[in-house]
Amino acid sequence: MRAVIYRENGPSSVLRLVGRPTPEPEPGEVRVQVHTSGVNPTDWKARSATPLSSPEQVPNHDGSGVIDAVGPGVDPDRIGERVWLWEAARQRLGGTAAEYLSCRRGTP
């Protein structure tokens, strides 16, 4: 899959489009094919100044998409459900600036 990442703080010029493995949902998680990734002030402020907690970060907290896979313990009838994502990058390495995102129901 494709994802936007940054490896250092700075303006939008630090963003890079890269290839990454498509995430597989873990127990209790769903995988969302992201259709829309929203950018809000929290996203660009974090990219500009917040110390990185890992070597690279996929930005953006908000988005929407469709569940395309479920992990163990999740009803497979959820596949095809349209969902809204919020705080997807909060305390995680992966935000919504990617083609796919795995998250727990009700929490990213």
Regions found by a protein language model. Name each.
Residues 10-15, 41-42:
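Short N-terminal binding/cap micro-motifs at the start of the first secondary-structure element
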Residues 83, 87-108:
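NAD(P)H dinucleotide-binding glycine-rich loop of Rossmann-like/cofactor-binding domains
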Residues 5, 22, 46, 102-103:
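Conserved hydrophobic "DFG−1" position in protein kinase catalytic cores
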Residues 44-46, 96:
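Conserved catalytic-core motifs of eukaryotic protein kinase domains, centered on the activation segment
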